[in-house]
Amino acid sequence: MGEDPTAQGIDINIAGNSRGSPSSYFSPYKNPNLKDGPKGEYLTDRLTDEAIIILEKFKDDPFFMYFPFYSIHTPLQGRKDLKKKYLNNKLVHADYAAMIECLDENIGRLMAALDELGLRDNTILLFSSDNGGIRKLSKQDPWRAGKGSYYEGGIRVPITVRWPGVVEPGSTCTEPVTGLDFYPTFLDAIGSSPSPGKILDGRSILPLLTGKGSFPKDRTLYWHFPVYLQNYAGEEDQSRDAKFRTRPGTVLRKGKWKLHEYFEDGALLLYDLENDPGETHNLAQEKPKKLQALKEDMYAWRKRTDSPVPSKRNPKYIPQKISTR
């Protein structure tokens, strides 16, 4: 939503700003868009309190609530009463586990509030994450790597949808979708459409939710990141190398096939996710026709979207060995 969510059409902004992580999960929060509570108040609890107040205020009106809990994000600071439960468990990170339980608890509070306000049957509830977990704290197996990576451990996350009377409870769908699909889906659900001239990269997944209508099989999804993401100073996370979480490149997925291209050395990594979900065996040499077809698709998309691709090497760059797996 950027530095100021209200510039994107949001009417009320509570605690949202350009930072992806809080200064502290305990008050005082040092957040310009959230008044401090009593000393020691826990951020996840406080944000849920604020969300419930908003629900109560607008329960008789149509509303859209975008509620990105800061949790579970660094700094890892679990609520003290929950952290105590995990201190003697050597198999888990006590703060991390406490933060997960607190998040789960507060999602339950939010759902209970919808029920109590009579909003359950007329509200679409969608829960997901913007990335995979931090591998050194929580392995994503069988997916490779973790947050910040193009590998499945970094970009594959579950989505849970509750929509009484529309989405069948307990049903599942294996069709890959992306966060870019949420906005057009919500528009479709309320019978609306984008503003004239508005170009959307995603598409409505309403047919997948309702089981009605058609949805393109094996559509192509793209990820493009032409810069470096964080020097990890050798921390092992199963990414392409231990130096950076992500290096400049583009990734494409079409059906069971996934293609990585890295700009520094032109490396092409081709994986069959159906038979190799952990992305361990590069098929670029074994499947030249498939590689070429996906590469042409990728290049055409970059041209169509005018995606930037770095063309000049940093004069201070010192080549180092990079994995080709």
Where would I find each of the regions flagged by the language model?
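A long, amphipathic alpha-helix that forms part
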Residues: T48-E56, K83-N122
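Long, internal low-complexity/basic segments
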Residues: F182, Y222, Y228, E264-A267, ...
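Histidine-centered active-site microenvironments of extracellular/periplasmic hydrolases
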Residues: E3-G9, L76-G78, N88, A112-V166, ...
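Substrate-binding rim/cap in mid-to-C-terminal beta-strand-loop elements of soluble/periplasmic
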Residues: A15, G20-K35, G108-E116, P142-I199, ...
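Loop/turn elements at helix/coil->beta-strand transitions in domains of secreted/extracellular proteins
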Residues: G9-D11, K59-M65, L119-L125, P216-D218, ...
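Active-site rim elements
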Residues: K35-E41, H93-A97, V166-P176, I190-P196, ...
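C-terminal, low-complexity/hydrophilic appendages and adjacent surface loops
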Residues: K147-E152, W223-A284
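Formylglycine-dependent
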Residues: M1-M65, F69-K80, Y232-R240
